[in-house]
C-alpha cells in the first residue's frame, strides 16, 4: 500500500507568506488573563484584521489553511480555530485530510512536538440523553482547553447548517461551559476564536450562515476559496457589482488563469458524441416550472406535464420512463429551471452507451500511458494509477443486479479488457508484462462473485446495512491510499478504479488520480463549470506517493458530456478568463493592460516606461490618439487588427488568458508533439554521447562518512516512536434540521498502553533506503543494533512516525555535510532521456510539447539553426527565455535552443535530477567548437535553485576535466547570455 507524500509547493509557500505578511499582529498593550481564549489580536473584530485568500480548485487550499493554523500557533500563540464549511461533504473532506497520517507526518517535520486536536460537531451530538440536555464532548473539549497546553492546537470543525441550528443558540442545557455559560454560542465567544471559512461564496454577508459566524464573535476571519460573494454598490446608473473582499482585494490571488497556465492543475479535454442533425434540432425549452407543473415549449408547440406524468407522452425520444417528479425535478433527479433546453435524443439508452464506451476507451488510453511511462527496457519511472468517475442519474440502474447501467458497463468493460489482454500477450518488455498481469487480474475480478473493479457512492448509502456497499463507500471516501495503490500488503493487485455517483461526490471529495469524468446526466442548474471539473483537476501522484508535476509527466482530464452541453468548453474558458487579474480589452489599450506590460518589461529592462510603450505602438500605427486599436494594420505584408499585433509584440498579455492548449474541445486525445530538427541535433551528437551516460554521485571520504552519519543519526532514541492506534466511533443519529438519519462519527485514541504493530523489519529498512537514497548495507547494521540492544526487539517502534523522523534527520545531516563534498563518476552504460533513445543510439523524431515549453508564439520567425521546427515557438517564461529564443545570434552560433525537461538528467545530491535550460554550439575559427549550457534563474533564487546550480556547475566542471569542450553559465537576463556567447566567440573562457 502506498503512502501519500505531501510536499511544499512554491505557490502554497507564497500563499502562506502573503497571509502572514497581512496578519495585524498580537496586541500586547492590554493585560490578558483568560487562558482559555486566544491572545488578543490587533484590529480584532474589524475587517482590517480579516484576510482573503483566493486559490483555484485543486491547488491545495486545504493544505494552506491547515498549515496556517500551525504557523499562527507557532509564531503568535493562537491556538483556537473554528473551521466553518458549507456542507457535511466538505466537512468530511477537511476532516479526512487533517486527521490523515500523511498530513500529520508531513507537518511534524516543521512543527515538532505540536499536535492538532480536531473537534467535529455532527448532527445529533446535542441529542437529549436520559432526560438531560448535555453539550457534545467535542464542544466541551474545545472550549475548556487552556493555552497552558502549549503543544496543542484546538480546531473545531463545523458545517454552516449545524452552526446556524437552534442547538447552538439555546441556553437551557443541564451543563455549563466557561464561566457558567449554558449557551454553545456564548461559550465559543469566550474563546475569542480565529474563524477559517472554506468556500466563501456560500457565506455572503447578508445570509444567515454568515450571521451565525458573526454570532461567535471571531477576532479574525480568514476566507479560502476560488470564488467570493458579490456585493452591490450604488443605485441606478451608478450601480456596480464587485467581489466582496474584506480589504477590497485578496491578500493572495492564485486565479484560474494562472493555475491552468502554470500547470498547477491538469489540462482538460472535453468530448461529447454528436447527434444526427434531426435529433439535435429537436429540443424543448422549459417555459416555466413549478412544484406541481412543468411547461415545455418547442416552437409554437406548448406541452404541460403534471406530477407523475411521463415525458414520453410529449415526445417519444424521452426514453426510460422519465417522469416529472415535482418540486422542479425529473424522476432522474435532473433539476429544472426556466430557459433550460431538453434534447430528447440525449435521454436514450443507446446515446448513454456511446458515452460509456468512449469513457472506457479514454480510460485505457490514459491508463496505458500512465502505467508504461515511456515503456523502455530500462524503465524506472514509477507507475501512476488511473481512476475514472461516472456521474449517473439512476441509482437502481447501477445498484440492482440486473440494472441497465451496471450490465452495460460490465459488458463493454469485459470486451475492452479481452481486446487489451490479447494485444499484450504478444509484448515482451518488463513493464508490458506487468500490465498484462494487471489486466488479467481486473478481468478475473470482474467475473468473480465479489468484483473489486468498480464501486458506487450515493447519498442513500449512508447508514446502509449492506456490508459490501459500506466497504465500497469506505474505499471511496476514506481509503484514498488504497484507491491510489496498485497492490495491497500481500502483493495482490488493487483493481478498483471505476467510481459511480450522482452529484454526491461533486464537492468535498477529491482524488488526484481521476483522469476521466463522464456525465451520464446533465447537472441541470448553471453551476460553476470549474466546480464540475474540479474532482479531476488535481495533479496526480505516482505509486510512491509523490506528486507528479506537469513538466515531469503532462496530465490531462478527459471530461465526457452529452450533446446538450456542447457549449461547455467555451463556457469554461470564459469563466476562467473572467477570473484573470487583467481583462483584455480588444477595442482599447486600457490602464490595466499598460500596467501589466510595463511591469513585466521592467523585469528585463528597468528603463522601460509607459511613454516608451505608447511611442512604440504609435510608430507601428497599432493605436489612434485615444489608444483605441485600429481594426486593420498591415506589417511585413500581413494584415491583422491592432489588438492582434499587440499580443504578438507584447506576449506578456497572453498571461491574462488561459492558453488555448489547456482546454480542448472535442478534439483527438493525442498529445501535442514537437518535431525535432534532426540535422541540428546531430551537431550535438558527440557531446550527447557524454550527456546520455549514467553518472553516480561519489561523495568525498574526508570527514564523516555515510556510515558515521547514519550511526550518529539512527542512534538517537527520540526518533523511535510507537504509534498509538485511533478508534472511530459511529452512530446513527437524526438530523434535527431535515429529519434525515446520518452517521455521526468521532475519532480518538485507544488506551495509552496499546500500540499499533510495526512494519516488518525488511520492509521498514527498504522504505528508509528508498526515501534517503542510502545503501541498505549502510543503514542495516546500526538499525539492527538499535532494535536489538536499545529497543529490546520491540518491532512496534518500526512505525510510520519513526520512518518519517529518520528520513528527515538523515536528509538534513547529509545535505548539510555533503553539499560541497561530492563529484560525478561516469558509469559504463547509457540511458534514454526525453530527447535521446539510447537503444537506437539516436535522437527522437518528436517529443511532447509540454516538456519544451508551456507557452506558444505562433508568429515567431523561423531560424534554421533552431533545435525545433518553428513556428510555433514554445517557451516557459517571457523573461529571459523569449528574447533568448528570438535573438539573431552571430553566425558562429551554429545550433541553439531550449532543452526539454529530462534531456540530460544530472543527478542532484538531494535526490532527483536536473537539466539546463539552453544549449549553444559555437564555432571558433582557430579552435574546436565549444558547447555552452545555460541555466536561467531569477535574481531572488530559492534554496532549491541554488542546489540545481551547484549540481550543474559540478557536473560540467567534471566534463571539462576530461577535456570535453563544454562551458556552463548561469544567467538572470538575456544580455548576460549574449555577453557570454560573444566572449566564447573571441576565445575567452567563461
From Swiss-Prot:
<dbReference type="InterPro" id="IPR006935">
    <property type="entry name" value="Helicase/UvrB_N"/>
</dbReference>
<keyword id="KW-0680">Restriction system</keyword>
<keyword id="KW-0949">S-adenosyl-L-methionine</keyword>
<protein>
    <recommendedName>
        <fullName>Type III restriction-modification enzyme StyLTI Res subunit</fullName>
        <ecNumber>3.1.21.5</ecNumber>
    </recommendedName>
</protein>
<dbReference type="Pfam" id="PF04851">
    <property type="entry name" value="ResIII"/>
</dbReference>
<feature type="domain" description="VRR-NUC">
    <location>
        <begin position="884"/>
        <end position="970"/>
    </location>
</feature>
<keyword id="KW-0540">Nuclease</keyword>
<dbReference type="InterPro" id="IPR027417">
    <property type="entry name" value="P-loop_NTPase"/>
</dbReference>
<keyword id="KW-0067">ATP-binding</keyword>
<dbReference type="GO" id="GO:0004386">
    <property type="term" value="F:helicase activity"/>
</dbReference>
<keyword id="KW-0238">DNA-binding</keyword>
<feature type="region of interest" description="Endonuclease domain">
    <location>
        <begin position="913"/>
        <end position="937"/>
    </location>
</feature>
<dbReference type="Pfam" id="PF08774">
    <property type="entry name" value="VRR_NUC"/>
</dbReference>
<keyword id="KW-0255">Endonuclease</keyword>
<dbReference type="GO" id="GO:0015668">
    <property type="term" value="F:type III site-specific deoxyribonuclease activity"/>
</dbReference>
<dbReference type="InterPro" id="IPR050742">
    <property type="entry name" value="Helicase_Restrict-Modif_Enz"/>
</dbReference>
<keyword id="KW-0547">Nucleotide-binding</keyword>
<dbReference type="InterPro" id="IPR014883">
    <property type="entry name" value="VRR_NUC"/>
</dbReference>
<dbReference type="GO" id="GO:0003677">
    <property type="term" value="F:DNA binding"/>
</dbReference>
<feature type="region of interest" description="Helicase-like domain">
    <location>
        <begin position="50"/>
        <end position="545"/>
    </location>
</feature>
<comment type="function">
    <text>A type III restriction enzyme that recognizes 2 inversely oriented double-stranded sequences 5'-CAGAG-3' and cleaves DNA 25-27 base pairs downstream. After binding to one recognition site undergoes random one-dimensional diffusion along DNA until it collides with a stationary enzyme bound to the second DNA site, which is when DNA cleavage occurs. DNA restriction requires both the Res and Mod subunits.</text>
</comment>
<keyword id="KW-0378">Hydrolase</keyword>
<dbReference type="GO" id="GO:0009307">
    <property type="term" value="P:DNA restriction-modification system"/>
</dbReference>
<comment type="subunit">
    <text>Contains two different subunits: Res and Mod.</text>
</comment>
<keyword id="KW-0347">Helicase</keyword>
<dbReference type="GO" id="GO:0005524">
    <property type="term" value="F:ATP binding"/>
</dbReference>
<comment type="similarity">
    <text>Belongs to the type III restriction-modification system Res protein family.</text>
</comment>
